[in-house]
C-alpha cells in the first residue's frame, strides 16, 4: 500500500538524522497515515480513505463532499 495521503498528497521524504556531534545519517520522514471511514450523506454509504491526520482535520473542517470532487478531478488527470 502506498504511504501517500489521498487528500493532501503528503508522501515520505528523506533527510538526515543529526546526532549530538552533528553527524548526518540518512532517514525517512513518513507521514502519519490512517485508514478512515467517512459517511457520505447524499449517497448514504461509507467510503474508506488512506488519509493523514492533517487531512482528517481538513475534512472535519470543510466537509467530505468538497474533497471528493477534488480527488475525482485529480484522478481523471492520471494521478
Swiss-Prot record:
Listed GO biological process terms: translation
This protein's UniProt keywords: Ribonucleoprotein, Ribosomal protein
Segments crossing the lipid bilayer: none
Superkingdom assignment: Bacteria
GO cellular component terms, A-Z: ribonucleoprotein complex; ribosome
Signal peptide: none
A GO molecular-function descriptor: structural constituent of ribosome
InterPro entries: Bacterial_rp_bL28, Ribosomal_bL28, Ribosomal_bL28/bL31-like_sf, Ribosomal_bL28_bact-type, Ribosomal_bL28_sf
UniProt family annotation: Belongs to the bacterial ribosomal protein bL28 family.
Name this protein carries in UniProt: Large ribosomal subunit protein bL28
